[in-house]
């Protein structure tokens, strides 16, 4: 039986009543959404995500999407006989891999997301950080337990973001969909972790919310319990004891920095849940883990 058919009229009314204060509160604000994980690969979740994004726009919130594409990149690398390598959660990116990353993110994933949102009545426009050179990047050197300043190829970090292109799209009533590729000072492309781009973009847009969609319920402790609120100090401890590692490291670092630099609320949420965005934004309980800025109490 379809989910919508088993919700009573009374439950629907309660859900709408609970959402109303949040709609009023967040109308006119920007929400930057890092889109990745299962929500990008499972057809039902992809469609649900697109509908949710359109609904956010309809109630006056300005969603800005920054997407990943790890599974799709891995699949293409496998087709050409290359194996993906990662260091501290970052993809090692030689010239051939960079060409594939840019082709997959800009040529396939971005267009698919744009098309899906537009199918459900939105006005999405896809952009890459190389368009108008609006995401300036510099080479990222990674520290590992064994060695500092490891060069992992054409992997960058955000040097600066010119938000004019994105703000212009928002003002035109569009939903920007951003592929996380930056441009270096010589015009070269850099693969940038989508979490880092989402965090920096949220800061520069003075976003009300930064929402990062993942394949887990949120940040978990060693016993598997969900941590609903985390301070930077607690996060430092979780990294030190090995609870947080790999792909969670750039996600957490980006969330902490965004919270410290004016983004009013940063959340790591479970993208496997239907309507995850709506559950976080429009319900009293919310879902996932909220990252607090320095000086805030959990």
Swiss-Prot record:
InterPro entries assigned: AceGlu_kinase-like_sf, AcgluKinase_fam, ArgB, Asp/Glu/Uridylate_kinase, Glu/AcGlu_kinase, NAGK-C
Question: For the site Transition state stabilizer, which positions are given?
Answer: 34, 251
From the UniProt record, list the reaction(s) this protein catalyses. N-acetyl-L-glutamate + ATP = N-acetyl-L-glutamyl 5-phosphate + ADP
Principal cellular location given in the protein's record:
cytoplasm
> Per its UniProt entry, which superkingdom is the organism in?
Bacteria
EC number(s): the record gives 2.7.2.8
| GO MF, one example | acetylglutamate kinase activity
Identify its protein family.
Belongs to the acetylglutamate kinase family. ArgB subfamily.
Please explain the role this protein plays, according to its UniProt record.
Answer: Catalyzes the ATP-dependent phosphorylation of N-acetyl-L-glutamate.
Q: What is this protein called?
A: Acetylglutamate kinase
Q: Which organism is it from?
A: Neisseria gonorrhoeae (strain NCCP11945)
Upper classification of the organism: Bacteria, Pseudomonadati, Pseudomonadota, Betaproteobacteria, Neisseriales
């Amino acid at each position: 039986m379809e989910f919508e058919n088993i919700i009573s009229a009374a439950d629907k009314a309660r859900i709408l009543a609970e959402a109303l204060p949040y709609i009023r509160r967040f109308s006119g604000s920007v929400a930057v959404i890092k889109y990745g994980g299962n929500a990008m690969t499972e057809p039902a979740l992809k469609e649900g995500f697109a509908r949710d994004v359109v609904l956010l726009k309809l109630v006056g919130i300005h969603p800005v999407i920054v997407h990943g594409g790890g599974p799709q990149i891995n699949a293409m690398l496998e087709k050409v006989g290359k194996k993906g390598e990662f260091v501290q959660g970052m993809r090692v990116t030689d010239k051939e891999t960079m060409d594939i990353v840019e082709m997959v993110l800009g040529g396939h994933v971005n267009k698919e997301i744009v098309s899906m949102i537009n199918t459900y009545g939105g006005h999405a426009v896809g952009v890459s950080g190389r368009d108008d050179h609006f995401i300036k990047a510099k080479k990222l050197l990674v520290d590992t337990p064994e060695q500092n300043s490891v060069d992992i190829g054409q992997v960058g970090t955000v040097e600066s973001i010119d938000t004019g292109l994105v703000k212009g799209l928002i003002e035109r009533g569009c939903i920007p969909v951003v592929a996380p590729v930056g441009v270096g000072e010589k015009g070269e492309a850099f693969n940038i972790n989508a979490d880092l781009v989402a965090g920096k973009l949220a800061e520069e847009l003075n976003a009300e919310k930064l929402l990062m969609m993942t394949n887990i319920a949120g940040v978990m402790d060693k016993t598997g319990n969900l941590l609903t609120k985390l301070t930077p100090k607690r996060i430092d401890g979780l990294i030190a004891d090995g609870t947080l590692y790999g792909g969670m490291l750039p996600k957490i670092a980006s969330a902490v920095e965004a919270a410290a630099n004016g983004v009013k609320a940063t959340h790591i949420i479970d993208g496997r849940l239907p309507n995850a965005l709506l559950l976080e934004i429009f319900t009293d309980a919310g879902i996932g883990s909220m990252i607090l800025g320095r000086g805030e109490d959990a």
